[in-house]
């Protein structure tokens, strides 16, 4: 694998069959192309659609370094690996599991990304001043559901690329059309 650092964020859902998406989808790919170990596994929060495959991932990698699993995310933590700055941000006043999502800001000299977990508008409002004006890449909050992605948040981050992590045929029909329009 070309780099010494490999981090995985979330592990996908448990499927109705009892399998999980990590084991059925990502693991076969990683066995042929991926790393033999992870530097860090970050679990944004405990909802099944993010954590359903965590046990399989931890078992496969014999993973020791985890955040959001045994070691909860708290406050703000920043570190640098190979010239890339990582800032782990969490809303200290969060009242819901989603708003307690571990979020991650990744910055290099050339680009930046923000991975938002399932935060909603209250967490967006409390974290907004910790975020840069403009990012290159954003994983939209809560799969593009209607509640987060406030206009202030969208304008502050002004992402060049937005990814909505959602099933095409998902029961919640994410991303919501209004949210997609806000990012255009």
What do the predicted segments below correspond to?
Residues 1-184:
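Non-globular, low-confidence helical/coil segments that flank catalytic cores
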């Amino acid at each position: 694998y070309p780099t010494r650092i490999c981090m995985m964020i979330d592990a996908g859902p448990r499927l109705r069959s009892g399998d999980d998406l990590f084991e059925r989808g990502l693991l076969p790919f990683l066995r042929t192309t991926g790393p033999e170990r992870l530097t860090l596994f970050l679990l944004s929060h405990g909802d099944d659609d993010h954590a359903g495959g965590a046990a399989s991932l931890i078992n496969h990698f014999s993973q020791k370094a985890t955040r959001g699993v045994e070691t909860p995310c708290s406050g703000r933590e920043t570190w640098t690996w190979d010239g890339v700055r990582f800032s782990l941000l969490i809303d200290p006043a969060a009242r819901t599991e989603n708003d307690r999502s571990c979020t991650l800001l990744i910055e290099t000299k050339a680009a930046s990304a923000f991975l938002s977990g399932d935060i909603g508008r209250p967490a967006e409002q409390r974290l907004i001043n910790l975020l840069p004006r403009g990012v290159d890449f954003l994983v939209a909050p809560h799969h593009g559901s209607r509640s987060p992605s406030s206009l202030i948040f969208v304008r502050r981050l002004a992402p060049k690329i937005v990814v909505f992590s959602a099933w095409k045929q998902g029961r919640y029909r994410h991303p919501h059309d209004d949210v997609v329009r806000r990012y255009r």
